[in-house]
């Protein structure tokens, strides 16, 4: 366990990566390419702990003089199918302490604590046609999905990408290279506010109308995502076809060592957990949350916020009953399908079975 200056001790689930490359994408955005400090044979970070899917994110621990550190989630722009290393892209924001710190101070050789890749903004298959809608730095997870779909799938990919002006376009050269490599499969539609004004729902609807039979992935600032959702609703695109990525600032410290609440007098429940193809049985104190129990047992259960906001810890309840304290992300359809948030679930039955592998 590593001690963190000004913070609680770090948990065993925390990983330390090294910045191998810093790429200036625009005047306001930089990509950070990561490497394992001691190489791929580092026993502290086996390759399975860095496995990820297109559309997922890393949670970074950024130093802070005021609080010791802050935790922020940044989408992976790299693709597990085309890139050797994990990479995230960070864009400056007016009030964004962490993003500004990374843009000002991140340099090659710097080590930074991260959590394992996580997130549910992931296509169920890459062999499909896609409609990808991005604005500003929202291109980051969209780029990962785009590269992966083109490399591994055989379908058509249409990307609508909105920016303030031409100088604000992140990955401009990379998108041109992809369009040249896949001229019959990739269509890129740029929207520049300097020329076209803010993208409205009606304008977006006209542009995306030919592509409404596809899975849709949306990421960008709130007003853009709302306009995109309104456009798709006007076109009667089914809600289950639309996937949206939203990040919230984390209030708790997901890097802190896990403390299992076992203060209750009632006998613990039993949790049977299927994770990465293996089945584990753990004792589950009635007052403890499932995620804390799994992490304390040394299992690499996925998570990010621990606050019920992001959905990264979602798993499927196969048997038994649980009580969720906070749920800001799962919709009724998800609940009907048995999804629960491990970071918010406490047992209500003596035995509970869940799986992360569905």
From Swiss-Prot:
Gene: hmp
Residues given in the record as [2Fe-2S] cluster binding sites: 305, 310, 313, 343
Top-level lineage group: Bacteria
Source organism: Mycobacterium tuberculosis (strain ATCC 25618 / H37Rv)
UniProt entry tagged with the keyword Iron: yes
Cofactor binding comment, as recorded: Binds 1 FAD per subunit.
Record's keyword annotation contains ATP-binding: no
Function per UniProt: Involved in the degradation of cholesterol. Catalyzes the introduction of a 9a-hydroxyl moiety into 1,4-androstadiene-3,17-dione (ADD) to yield the 9alpha-hydroxy-1,4-androstadiene-3,17-dione (9OHADD) intermediate which spontaneously form 3-hydroxy-9,10-seconandrost-1,3,5(10)-triene-9,17-dione (HSA) via the meta-cleavage of ring B with concomitant aromatization of ring A.
InterPro entries assigned: 2Fe-2S_ferredoxin-like_sf, 2Fe-2S_ferredoxin-type, 2Fe2S_fd_BS, Beta-grasp_dom_sf, Cbr1-like_FAD-bd_dom, FAD-bd_FR_type, Flavoprot_Pyr_Nucl_cyt_Rdtase, FNR_nucleotide-bd
Biological process according to GO: cholesterol catabolic process; cholesterol metabolic process; response to hypoxia; response to nitrosative stress; steroid biosynthetic process
Segments forming domain 2Fe-2S ferredoxin-type: 269-358
Up-regulation conditions: Induced by KstR.
Keyword tags: 2Fe-2S, Cholesterol metabolism, FAD, Flavoprotein, Iron, Iron-sulfur, Lipid degradation, Lipid metabolism, Metal-binding, Oxidoreductase, Steroid metabolism, Sterol metabolism, Virulence
Entry cofactors: FAD; [2Fe-2S] cluster
Pathway noted in the entry: Lipid metabolism; steroid biosynthesis
CDD domains, per the entry: fer2 (cd00207), PA_degradation_oxidoreductase_like (cd06214)
Enzyme class: oxidoreductase
Designated name of the protein: 3-ketosteroid-9-alpha-monooxygenase, ferredoxin reductase component
